[in-house]
């Protein structure tokens, strides 16, 4: 299963800077620190953790517990992802509008793809518009007809092979798993 891989969490002075499955993110962060940071960090760690530990961590982490490296625009997009919470999925175009950049859907999508802390910053909850349209169609059909025993739960919708939830840095299957976890978990 996609969740069985070794996950690496990079921390700088105790703050989460990246989550990945390879040490490339650590190298990227080291290059960024070397070229742009005036103050040297006291401690940089890269620790392997399990998927379950990441899921537990994301329930307790606060925005100030993270240290993000990116452009001002990228940080704005990542903050908006964080603020949107984990209770809904949005299309890229709807999310770009939420970011007050409706005309810049591609730029917003690119920033989403560069999210250094996926899973915790829920970039997986932004999906192609076609997926949203199909989900709405299923929900409308269910409301306008007699319920015929079809399971319209989140799990059933996520398992519908006709719905493409889009690309994800760790694969499509894990994206669906994360959507399922987030949408079926009660939020505080």
Can you say where each PLM-predicted feature lies in the sequence?
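Charged low-complexity interaction tracts in eukaryotic proteins
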Residues: 121-167
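Structural motif
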Residues: 15-16, 116, 125
């Amino acid at each position: 299963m996609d969740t069985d891989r070794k996950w690496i969490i990079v921390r700088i002075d105790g703050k989460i800077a990246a989550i990945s499955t390879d040490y490339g993110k650590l190298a990227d962060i080291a290059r960024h620190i070397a070229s742009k940071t005036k103050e040297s960090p006291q401690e940089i760690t890269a620790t392997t953790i399990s998927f379950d530990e990441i899921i537990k961590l994301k329930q307790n982490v606060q925005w100030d517990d993270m240290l993000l490296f990116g452009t001002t625009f990228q940080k704005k997009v990542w903050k908006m992802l964080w603020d949107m919470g984990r209770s809904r999925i949005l299309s890229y175009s709807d999310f770009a509008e939420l970011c007050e950049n409706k005309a810049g859907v591609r730029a917003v999508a690119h920033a989403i793809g560069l999210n250094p802390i996926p899973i915790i910053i829920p970039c997986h909850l932004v999906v192609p518009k076609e997926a949203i349209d199909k989900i709405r169609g299923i929900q409308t059909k269910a409301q306008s007809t007699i319920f015929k025993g079809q399971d319209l739960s989140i799990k059933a919708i996520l398992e519908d092979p006709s719905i493409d939830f889009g690309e994800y840095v760790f694969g499509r299957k894990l994206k669906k798993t994360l959507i399922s976890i987030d949408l079926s978990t009660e939020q505080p």
